[in-house]
UniProtKB/Swiss-Prot annotation:
Family statement: Belongs to the FUN14 family.
UniProt name for this protein: FUN14 domain-containing protein 1
Species this chain originates from: Xenopus tropicalis (Western clawed frog)
Membrane topology, record value: Multi-pass membrane protein
Pfam families: FUN14
Main location: mitochondrion
Amino acid sequence: MAARREPSSDDESYEVLDLTEYARRHHWWNRLFGRNSGPLTEKYSVATQIVMGGVSGWCAGFLFQKVGKLAATAVGGGFLLLQIASHGGYIQIDWKRVEKDVNKAKRKIKKEANKSVPEINTLIEESTDFIKKNIVVSGGFVGGFLLGLAS
C-alpha cells in the first residue's frame, strides 16, 4: 500500500498562470479547428494569399456578372412588356398615384436613413479594419473580382 502523506503546511507556494500569455499563444480557433488553423497572414505565404484572394474574387466576379446579366434582362424585359401593354391599351397607369407613392417612399427612406447612421459607421469601421489586417488577400480578391467581371 502506498504511504499516506501528511497535509502540507500553509506556506506552500503555488504556480501562477499568466492567462494573457496563454491567450496569445492559444487562439480560440485553435481549440475549435485545430493547431493548423489561424489567420491567413500567419499561415500562408504572400503569393499563396494573393492566389487565394484572386481565385475567390474571380469566382465571385464571374457569378456576379452572370447573375447581373440575368437580373438586368428580367427587369428590362418586364419594363418592355409593361410599355407594350400600356401602349396597346391593355393597362392604364395612374401616374398621379405613382408619383404620390414614390414621394411617400422617398420620405420613408430619408427617415430610416437618419436612424441607421451609427450602424453603418460601425460596419464601415469593421470592414476597414478587416481589409487593413488582410490587405494581401483583399487586394487579390479585388483584382480577381474585376477579372471575373471582365471575363
